[in-house]
């Protein structure tokens, strides 16, 4: 079964997503709660959502918050020989992770698949054929960054006018404005 892939990311105006292994902006509690809700809440009883992330993204999560709770966590790494402490699975590549999900043991447990970073994992997911959604929080300010979100190809990806559970209005926390957007491609 080919499942839609969902990438979720917060980006600054200069497309920054990270700085020194952390977020480039101060912690935004409501934005973080949106991430938690979107990636955790499953619409199917008895199933869990699954998050896929690169090794650096995994280690950027404070240890007390690893694994991301109430979600199946897959870490991607070509170097690691076994899943890092707390991770449920390790895969060498995104393709391997997606194959793993189709394993009979996992396939019936997984509802929605979320890609949560970093840059190269997002890029690979965005270039995959098929149904891909991008849940983008647009932080309406520039922040110095050393990790960036790949360019969105607007020929392929269309901005949806609305999406269930995604607020439409501009949000503000700590003097920082941001808005939630959802893009989709289906080819």
Swiss-Prot record:
Q: Which GO terms describe its cellular component?
A: cytoplasm; mitochondrion
Q: How does it assemble?
A: Homodimer.
- Pfam families found in the cross-reference section: DHFR_1
Q: Which family does it belong to?
A: Belongs to the dihydrofolate reductase family.
Q: What is its main location?
A: mitochondrion
This one is known as: Dihydrofolate reductase
As recorded in Swiss-Prot or TrEMBL, the protein's gene is named: DHFR
Question: In this protein, which residues make up the domain named DHFR?
Answer: 4-185
Localization annotation? Mitochondrion; Cytoplasm
For this UniProt record, the keywords arranged alphabetically read as follows: Cytoplasm, Methotrexate resistance, Mitochondrion, NADP, One-carbon metabolism, Oxidoreductase, RNA-binding
């Amino acid at each position: 079964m080919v499942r839609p892939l969902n990438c979720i990311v917060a980006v600054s105006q200069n497309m920054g997503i990270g700085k020194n292994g952390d977020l480039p902006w101060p912690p935004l509690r409501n934005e973080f709660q949106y991430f938690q809700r979107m990636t955790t809440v499953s619409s199917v009883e008895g199933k869990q959502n699954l998050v896929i992330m690169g090794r650096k993204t995994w280690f950027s999560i404070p240890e007390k918050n690893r694994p991301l709770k109430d979600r199946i966590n897959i870490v991607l790494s070509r170097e690691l020989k076994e899943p890092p402490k707390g991770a449920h699975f390790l895969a060498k590549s995104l393709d391997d992770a997606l194959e793993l999900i189709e394993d009979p043991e996992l396939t019936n447990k997984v509802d929605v698949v979320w890609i949560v970073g970093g840059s190269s994992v997002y890029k690979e997911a965005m270039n995959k054929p098929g149904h891909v959604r991008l849940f983008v929080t647009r932080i309406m300010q520039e922040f110095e960054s050393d990790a960036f979100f790949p360019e969105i190809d607007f020929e392929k990806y269309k901005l949806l006018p609305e999406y269930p559970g995604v607020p439409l209005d501009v949000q503000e926390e700590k003097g920082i404005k941001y808005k939630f957007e959802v893009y989709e491609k289906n080819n």
